[in-house]
Amino acid sequence: MQGSVTEFLKPRLVDIEQVNPTRAKVTLEPLERGFGHTLGNALRRILLSSMPGCAVTEVEIDGVLHEYSSKEGVQEDILEILLNLKGLAVTIEGKDEAMLTLSKSGTGPVTAADITHDGDVTIMNPDHVICHLTGNNDISMRIRVERGRGYVPASARAQTEDDDRPIGRLLVDASFSPVARIAYNVEAARVEQRTDLDKLVIDMTTNGTIDPEEAIRRSATILAEQLDAFVELRDVTEPEQKEEKPEFDPILLRPVDDLELTVRSANCLKAEAIHYIGDLVQRTEVELLKTPNLGKKSLTEIKDVLASRGLSLGMRLENWPPASLVDDL
C-alpha cells in the first residue's frame, strides 16, 4: 500500500557483506532521492574523524637525539621509523595509555612482533615492519601508546608541554581513528513503480582494532545523538516563554539499555542497580572493576560508548537522582 505523498521512505533493508576480518560493505535501501549522499557523506566524515582508538604518541630511541637524524646499523632514517610506528594497530584495555619496549640485535627486519608489552595491550598487526638492521647491530626504543579520538599533530601537543621536555623524546603525529579507508557509493533503487530512489553502499576498511559493522553502528549513534538537538528546536514564531532549565542533560535520564552494550556488560550493570546513564557516569573505573563478572574488556566497551556521547566515568552530578526518577523506581 502506498503511503501519503508527504511521508518519507525509511530504509527496510540493511545488508552487511563481510569481505574479510577488516573490511565490510554495508548496503542500505531504499532511501529518498538525495538521501544517499546526505547520509553517506555524514557517516564517512564521522568514521574518519570521530571514532575513538589508540595510537603511538611518543618514542624514545637509544642514541637518537632528534627525528632529523639516522642511527648506525639501521637501514631507515629516524623519520621513516616514526612513520612506520604510526602504522601500528594497537588496542589498550582498562586504561588510557601504555608503554611498550622494543629491543633487538642482529641483522634483518624488526617487526611489531618484537615489541614487549603487558597483557592489557594487543598488537593486531605483528608482521608490520618497523625498520631493518644491518651489519649485526642493535636497536632499543620505548614507545608510548595512548587512547584518543581524531587526529592530533605532534606540534599541537608540543605547545602544551613544558619547555624542559627531555631531549630525545620524539613526539609523533597521532591518528587515533581505527578506520583506514572509507568510501561510499550511491546506486539506483526501486520500490514498486518508483525508480528515483537511492541505495547507499558503504565500503569500509579498519586497522583490525574494531569490527567494521561495529564502527558503522557507533558512527550512526554519534550522528543521531548530535541531531537530537535539532529535533528539540521550537518554532521561532512562538512567543517566548520562560522555562526552567533542565537540571540534568536528557541523555543522563535515559536507561543504560539505550547504550546498546553487550549482554554481559548490561547484566553486570543491572546487578549493581545501575539503571540510568546518570547512575553509570558517576562510577569510577575502580568501582566498576569491582563489579562481579565485569572485566577490563567490558570496561573499555563502556568507556568507548560513553565517549561517543561526550560522557565519561567519574562525573559528579549534584542532586542526583532527580525526583522524577525516584518516583519511577
Swiss-Prot record:
Sequence segments annotated as region (Alpha C-terminal domain (alpha-CTD)): 248-329
Keyword flag Lipoprotein: no
Domain of life per record: Bacteria
One BP annotation, GO: DNA-templated transcription
Pfam family membership, one: RNA_pol_A_CTD
S-S bridge residues: none
EC numbers for this chain: 2.7.7.6
Gene Ontology CC annotation, any one: DNA-directed RNA polymerase complex
Signal peptide from the UniProt entry: none
Keywords: DNA-directed RNA polymerase, Nucleotidyltransferase, Transcription, Transferase
Methyltransferase listed as a keyword: no
Annotated segments matching region Alpha N-terminal domain (alpha-NTD): 1-234
An example Gene Ontology molecular-function term: protein dimerization activity
Reaction catalysed by this enzyme: RNA(n) + a ribonucleoside 5'-triphosphate = RNA(n+1) + diphosphate
UniProt cross-references to InterPro entries, sorted A to Z: DNA-dir_RNA_pol_insert, DNA-dir_RNA_pol_RpoA/D/Rpb3, DNA-dir_RpoA, RBP11-like, RNAP_asu_C, RNApol_insert_sf
Subunit comment: Homodimer. The RNAP catalytic core consists of 2 alpha, 1 beta, 1 beta' and 1 omega subunit. When a sigma factor is associated with the core the holoenzyme is formed, which can initiate transcription.
NCBIfam families for this protein: PRK05182.1-2, PRK05182.2-5, rpoA
HAMAP family reported for this sequence: RNApol_bact_RpoA
Family the UniProt entry places it in: Belongs to the RNA polymerase alpha chain family.
Its job: DNA-dependent RNA polymerase catalyzes the transcription of DNA into RNA using the four ribonucleoside triphosphates as substrates.
Domain notes: The N-terminal domain is essential for RNAP assembly and basal transcription, whereas the C-terminal domain is involved in interaction with transcriptional regulators and with upstream promoter elements.
Name this protein carries in UniProt: DNA-directed RNA polymerase subunit alpha
Annotated gene: rpoA
